[in-house]
């Protein structure tokens, strides 16, 4: 299993490959109050190939941790959107 920095770099590479606008880490890992086996929560915006991105995260990401991916271009609860806005850490943003 790769270090989290390497995992985040892989996520960035997948975002670039799938033409995403932005990827945001949220949840306990973004807040810094995670446990060692806590999952990785990421939100993706403007991803042209979201299905491919999800596939790469599920099948190719070098981690044994669970990864939850939400698509910010779909309808999400206001509570979740508020959490992402409050706690989110940008992992990738297209320039």
Question: What do these predicted regions represent?
Answer:
Residues 1-22, 30-36, 45-95:
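Catalytic core of pol beta-like nucleotidyltransferases
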């Amino acid at each position: 299993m790769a270090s989290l920095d390497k995992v985040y770099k892989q996520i960035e590479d997948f975002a670039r490959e799938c033409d995403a606008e932005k990827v945001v880490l949220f949840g306990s890992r973004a807040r810094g109050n995670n446990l060692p086996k806590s999952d990785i929560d990421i939100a993706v915006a403007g991803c042209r190939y979201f299905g491919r991105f999800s596939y790469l995260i599920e099948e190719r990401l070098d981690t044994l941790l669970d990864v939850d991916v939400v698509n910010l271009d779909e309808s999400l609860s206001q509570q979740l959107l508020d959490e992402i806005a409050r706690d989110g850490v940008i992992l990738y943003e297209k320039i």
